Each structure stands twice: as structure tokens, then as C-alpha cells.
Amino acid sequence: MVGQGITTVVTGNCGFSATGYDPKGKYVDTIGSDSFALDSKHAIPDFKKWIEYLDHHTPLNVATYIGHGSVRSSINGLTKKEMTKEDYQKMLDLLEYALQNGAVGISVGLMYRPGIFVDKEELYDLGKLCKKYNKTMAFHARANSAVSMGYKSLLGRPHLLRAIDEIVDIGKTTGCKIQNSHLIFVGTKSWKCVDESLKLLHSLNDEGIPTAFDMYSYPLGASTITVILPKWYQRLPLQKRNRFFVKLRLSIEIFITKKLLGFDFDDIQIAYVQ
């Protein structure tokens, strides 16, 4: 990478980091399972020690977020199961420890498990932590398209704009710095949302809340198959997903979504299967 002129990398995006989680958590093996495979046997879960390791093993500058999804899933798994007060506080403590020891902020992946199940109050708590340490809260938004599986209603305000509304609300409520990772417009039906998306994000800067976004430098993106699956389906245990009426409902929803999205399976290339 250095030979190409790359001197700095930013990692830990979209709610997932390779460190900072609870190594004794019951669900360590679920970390990143929708997006990547974490080898917990060779990982360094302590955020401070991980940073110290990097200082001596790479010529690159590395800026990393602490992934809310990694920490949360190590403690509570990938399901919608409500966290106990003790587990919730443990999650906040681990996130705060990372912020105290070099994390540039907290990243959330609201399109991925467990982020899709997180309510507004939890997001406010994350924003308050970032504000406390003058760090950034980075969002993989709930939707990057006009319609998505992130919201129940397929009609009305485009889902992409609803997702940015949520980000703006958290910024205004907590006052933390905001990074929208990534501002993309999936499907031709979403292209009409460009101007309003920019206006919404600029409104935070106008109110004195530092806000930025990044974009892909190429006309494609990489994600996981779960982003086209609705939340109600992902909540189901595996043994119920093959039931006839479950598959029928899923097929109907995906068919309607494709028509409204301007995006189809022909636009998807499967890179690998775990």
C-alpha cells in the first residue's frame, strides 16, 4: 500500500471492528458473521493493546472506529433479544474504554445485525459518548435506496431520506460530530434524492455540528445478502424460515421491492460464500 502512495487507512466502519469487544462474551463467535469472519483465537480484543500492537507492526497510519456491532454482538448476539441493564452498561463501558484509548469514534451499522434492531435511545447514548470525548459517530444508514427492507412501509418518504433524517436527529439531539458512511444512491429510483440528502446533511453543519460523508470512488458497492432481507425475517429462528407462508411472504416483498427500487438480482454479483 505504501508503494501506491497510501499512508493512512480508516477501519472499523459500519459497526464492525476487529477489536474492542468482550472476549468473555457468550456470543464472541457471532461477531461480524454477516460481513466478515473474525478469528477470535488470534485477535486482540483489548482496544488499547491492539493499538499498541499496530504501532509496532505497520508503517501505515491507522485510524479506527470502535464498532458498536462488534461490542454489542459479543455480549448479546445478533438477535433482537433485549439486553439486561448489566449487559447494556458493559457495552457502554467497552465503547467508552475504546474512546479513551485512541478510537476516533463509534461506528454503527444500522443495515446489519445487530444494528437493525437498535432503538433510538441506544443511538442517543452512543452519540452522547462521542460528544463527551469530542469523537465522531459514523453511520452506515438503515437504507441507501428509495425503498429497502429497513422500513415497513414501502410508500411515502423515500427510505434513504428517512435514514438520513434519523442521522440528523441524532446529531441535533446529542451534538456529536457526524460521519455518514457512505452516501450512496442504490437503484435508479434513488437518484432523485441526491439534492435533499445533501441539504439535510448540510443543515447539521449550519447548526454548528461538524458533519461529513464519504462516497465510493467506483460505480459499485460491496455488502452482504442480509441487506435485502427484511427485519421480520432475520428475527426468525432458522427452523421457521423454510415454512411455506414465510417463504411466500418473503418472495412477495422482494418482488415488490425490486420493482420500486430500480435494481434487480442481475445487478448483483456473488463474491464469496462462507
Show where each model-derived region lies.
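Short low-complexity, flexible loop/linker segments enriched in glycine and/or proline
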Residues: 23-28, 32, 79, 121-124, ...
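Active-site neighborhoods of metal-dependent hydrolases
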Residues: 54, 58-75, 82-85, 94-112, ...
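Divalent-metal coordination cores built from histidine and acidic residues
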Residues: 1-105, 134-135, 209
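Glycine- and other small-residue-rich loops at beta-strand/loop junctions that grip anionic moieties
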Residues: 39, 115, 156, 189-190
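Amphipathic, non-transmembrane alpha-helical secondary structure
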Residues: 3, 48, 85-96, 100, ...
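Divalent metal-binding pocket/active-site signature
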Residues: 104-163
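Short gly/pro/ser/thr-enriched loop/turn and capping motifs at secondary-structure boundaries
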Residues: 16-20, 145, 219-221
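Generic hydrophobic alpha-helical membrane-span motif
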Residues: 10-11, 108, 146, 220
